[in-house]
Amino acid sequence: MDLNQTDWKKNNEEDNESIIIDVRTQEEYNLGHIKKSILIDINQPDLFMESISNLDKNYSYYVYCRTGNRSDMACSLMNQNGLKAYNLVGGIVEWKGDIKKN
């Protein structure tokens, strides 16, 4: 499901069983990422599918990438695997919240 930034952030903050997933590359993640996010690179399809198969289906997953395209694809795959995944429309380039840099 696609959510705008306001709803994505609000729903994530109100959800006690949520995890933020960044589906960009390691290099992009190192340049800056949303606080408390974990990296699962969708550009590594085998590793991505293995990683999502190990995720807890009781949690909600708030997913983002640079502009929202890769995260949209990731959410589709995650939803097909029985996970509740929410795409950040516009991605990190439109994010107005805090960014953590490595």
Describe the residue ranges of each PLM region.
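Rhodanese-like catalytic fold shared by cysteine-dependent sulfurtransferases
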Residues: M1-S18, Q26-S60, R66-N102
